[in-house]
């Protein structure tokens, strides 16, 4: 067990990966099964994106974006998210909001403004955090770091099914193009680029079911906890 992990008051599992890799669904199920709190860090960026779009703020207006990030009036409950008292759970899933979130996430000042808010999610008995830099930046001391990937085709098909089920129009081809563009932007940004932590366990979920991925992550967590107790 590392010194940093030993210093954590409660265990943290981070699940990072690109858009539509399934990390959110997996994180939600892991948190439910372990009775841990859940941090969907992507929702925070989407909230900043949605709020900025409603105020007609350009994604290069860093000062205004930081203000929004610091002043977010947000409430999480179960699988619902409220912004200024309005349930925006469905609005946050729109592709335009996701693209805006990816664009503003390149700004270090915005990420810094959300950092303390993300760290505050760590409470007893533990936390499952999903995002793009949970294991590399926000919780580098996590007891288990998972980097979940999948092919662009598999991710586009998953996202297509999700959007159609929620009443949005989309095509697999357009979604594939959007995913490739967002992947490139996330991987090449100068601040907290999308990459696996050095000690992350990588898992390609292209040909796996959600249950199979959840089972693998739980197995890794039990292995880590068993090793920590042995030490």
Curated annotation (Swiss-Prot):
EC class: transferase
Protein name (Swiss-Prot/TrEMBL): Cytidylate kinase
Catalysis performed (reactions): CMP + ATP = CDP + ADP; dCMP + ATP = dCDP + ADP
Enzyme Commission code: 2.7.4.25
Listed Pfam families: Cytidylate_kin (PF02224)
GO terms of biological process kind: nucleobase-containing small molecule interconversion; pyrimidine nucleotide metabolic process
Disulfide linkage: none
One annotated GO molecular function: CMP kinase activity
Binding site for ATP: 17-25
Family statement: Belongs to the cytidylate kinase family. Type 1 subfamily.
Family annotation (InterPro entries): Cytidylate_kin, Cytidylate_kinase_dom, P-loop_NTPase
Gene3D superfamilies recorded: P-loop containing nucleotide triphosphate hydrolases
Record-level GO cellular component terms: cytosol
Organism encoding this protein: Ralstonia pickettii (strain 12J)
PANTHER family: CYTIDYLATE KINASE, CYTIDYLATE KINASE/PANTOATE-BETA-ALANINE LIGASE
Subcellular location(s) per record: Cytoplasm
Keywords, alphabetical: ATP-binding, Cytoplasm, Kinase, Nucleotide-binding, Transferase
């Amino acid at each position: 067990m590392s010194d940093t992990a030993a210093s954590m008051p409660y265990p943290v599992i981070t699940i990072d990966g690109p858009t539509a890799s399934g990390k959110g669904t997996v994180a939600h199920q892991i948190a439910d099964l372990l009775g841990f709190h859940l941090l969907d860090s992507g929702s925070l960026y989407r909230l900043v994106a949605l709020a900025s779009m409603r105020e007609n703020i350009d994604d290069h207006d860093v000062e205004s974006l930081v203000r929004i990030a610091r002043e977010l009036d947000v409430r999480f409950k179960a699988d619902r998210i409220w912004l200024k008292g309005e349930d925006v759970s469905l609005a946050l899933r729109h592709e335009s909001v996701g693209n805006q979130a990816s664009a503003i996430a390149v700004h270090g000042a915005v990420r810094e403004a959300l950092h303390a808010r993300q760290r505050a999610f760590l409470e007893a008995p533990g936390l499952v955090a999903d995002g793009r830099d949970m294991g590399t930046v926000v919780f580098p001391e996590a007891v288990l770091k998972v980097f979940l990937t999948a092919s662009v085709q598999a991710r586009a098909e998953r996202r297509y099914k999700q959007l159609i089920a929620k009443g949005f129009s989309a095509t697999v081809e357009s979604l594939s193009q959007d995913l490739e563009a967002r992947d490139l932007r996330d991987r090449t940004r100068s601040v907290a680029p999308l990459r696996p932590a050095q000690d992350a366990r990588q898992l390609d979920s292209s040909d796996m079911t959600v249950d199979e991925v959840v089972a693998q992550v739980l197995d890794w967590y039990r292995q880590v906890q068993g090793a920590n107790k042995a030490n």
